[in-house]
Amino acid sequence: EEVLGTYKSRTDEKYSRIVTKFVRQLRHPTRIRETELGDLISDVLKDALGVDIFLLGSGSIRNEQLGPIVTKGDLRECFPYDDAVHLVYVTGAQLKHMFMRMLRDEVWEGAHCEFYQLSRGLLVEYDQATHSFLRFEFEGEPVDDDKVFSLGLQHFHFLNMKDSFDITPEELRKNHSIRVISTSCTQVIEEALQAGQHQNATVARGVVGRRATSRNPIGPSSA
């Protein structure tokens, strides 16, 4: 009993350790829209792993809010899936094809579909009525079909690329070899936040329109 008590005490101490503090609480109210928490975590993984784009499985975020004080336990509860991360390379044309699959009508009609949070730099505006992109930009420039981008994906989503994106690893290997660049995305997130990255006011900017949908071409939306 004494041993168990000591173990519990050490475990409690470990998970109550403060990882970071945000300027305010960040929210993730739905998995089928861009969210503050989705922006934060996708940005952390993009920057820490050095990829052009990180597509974060929206369902990986299990809580509707996090912070402003974030303990190790809070982070693990909010983001419990400790996947490896795969680095793949996609052309602009393939990236657009992947998003067409992700934004198909079934997603908005409540079907069980994967949805993704976008890292900083990628802006997609989609007209649901015409099934076309109004804007598809990277770093402020229209995405060229032939340009190749480095893209980070969690292991689960890498394994399910065909269903989620209607594309296969075999197709992407024609662009470049595929490799694992992290064995623990949770550790990457924790270490980046603990180092003081992504915790200032710019993280808490609200939803900034990295991905927007509209039934009419009304211009950028922050939906």
Functional labels for PLM-detected ranges:
Residues 1-48, 52-223:
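Catalytic centers of hydrolytic enzymes
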